[in-house]
Amino acid sequence: MARGQLYIISAPSGAGKTSLVSALLKEDKLAQVSISHTTRQVRPGEQDGVNYFFISREEFLAQAQAGDFLEHAEVFGNFYGTSQAWVESTLAKGVDVILEIDWQGAQQVRKLRPEAKSIFILPPSLEALQQRLESRGQDSAEVIQRRLQEAANEISHYPEYDYLVFNDDFDHALEELKSVFRAERLRLSVQQVRFEAELRGMLSSQSS
């Protein structure tokens, strides 16, 4: 069985990353979003091991100290991390693992997993991004401006990624995202493992 591929997907807030990944997973049964470990409280409707692995702050810090996380960060006083063991066991089953992380997390992962493929999703423009953030109706004008500044910083790191997807049209962007996954699964190193018996049979019949 061919191993799964590790993917990093990053985007500025409001670029449509979560919606694109959700749409991808509805059609692609060989991919899964990483389930992070976190120290924050469980919210209504969430399940341990489904949405997150909920652990104590002490457990998290001990695991981080032991090097158990591919990447980890503190967000609004809570810790979030990606378990190396969970990622490895999922990849070993032939399932692709998607890490939805920012550029800083991506840099951490690349140091430990240089074979990871990374995809950056862009909005058509900062103006379009501002319109999307405003249309949500969730944030004040001040928060939106801060998010736009953060987005500009995030976008400046796009050259660090392997693939670039412009989300100016959702369906087109989704097709491009799916194309990346299809192309990676057709790489020689993957196909050699997947069709090992068939290839061996063809070559042995030639030599006999």
UniProtKB/Swiss-Prot annotation:
Species whose genome carries this gene: Hahella chejuensis (strain KCTC 2396)
A single MF term (Gene Ontology): ATP binding
UniProt: ATP binding residues: 11-18
Catalytic activity: GMP + ATP = GDP + ADP
Entry keyword set: ATP-binding, Cytoplasm, Kinase, Nucleotide-binding, Transferase
Entry's localization field: Cytoplasm
Enzyme Commission designation: 2.7.4.8
Its biological purpose: Essential for recycling GMP and indirectly, cGMP.
Organism lineage: Bacteria, Pseudomonadati, Pseudomonadota, Gammaproteobacteria, Oceanospirillales
Main location: cytoplasm
SUPFAM superfamilies according to UniProt: P-loop containing nucleoside triphosphate hydrolases
Gene Ontology cellular component list: cytosol
Top-level taxon of origin: Bacteria
Keyword Transferase on entry: yes
Name assigned to this protein: Guanylate kinase
PROSITE patterns from the UniProt entry: GUANYLATE_KINASE_1, GUANYLATE_KINASE_2
